[in-house]
């Protein structure tokens, strides 16, 4: 049978996620994968635009943040987001091609909730989103 087009997952369905990545191919692939779980996706092409979109778009419940981007990288963007009171507990998952332990530690040190290295395993990413969104629901 054809793989489920719309995967029903009550933790993910209808949730709004912000993708911040400068590579349109990554944005397209992530958007396609997350929309299959009935998630709502908005995106920005660098950290500065991501922060602007986060401020201007109500209801964003998680951020997927690339690290290496022009204008404002993911480290700077996560630091700025964590400096805003209303986003201190917003789940931010860092997405990076750098896979060394120090890279993970650097991401967590500036405010990432979690970290996943590229190339992304979509099942692992969905699992992380499920965990962080569930935790967010439980803390309300």
Segments (PLM) and residue ranges:
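Charged docking surfaces used in two-component/phosphorelay signaling
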Residues: 28-36
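Active-site beta3 strand of CheY-like receiver
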Residues: 58-65
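C-terminal output helix
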Residues: 120-129, 137
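Receiver (REC) domain active-site loop signature in two-component systems and cognate sites
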Residues: 69-72
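Helix N-cap/capping motif at the beta->alpha junctions
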Residues: 22, 43-52, 74
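Disordered, acidic interdomain junction associated with two-component signaling
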Residues: 1-16, 51, 55, 131-140
């Amino acid at each position: 049978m054809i793989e489920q087009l719309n995967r029903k997952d009550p933790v993910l369905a209808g949730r709004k996620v912000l993708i911040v990545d400068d590579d349109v191919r990554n944005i397209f692939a992530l958007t396609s994968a997350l929309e299959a779980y009935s998630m709502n996706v908005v995106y920005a092409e660098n950290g500065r635009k991501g922060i602007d979109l986060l401020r201007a778009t109500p209801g964003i419940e998680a951020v997927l943040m690339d690290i290496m981007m022009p204008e404002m990288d993911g480290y700077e963007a996560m630091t700025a987001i964590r400096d805003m009171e209303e986003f201190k507990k917003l789940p931010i998952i860092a997405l990076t091609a750098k896979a060394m332990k120090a890279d993970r530690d650097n991401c967590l040190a500036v405010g990432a909730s979690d970290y996943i290295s590229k190339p992304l395993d979509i099942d692992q990413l969905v699992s992380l989103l499920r965990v962080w969104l569930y935790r967010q629901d439980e803390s309300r």
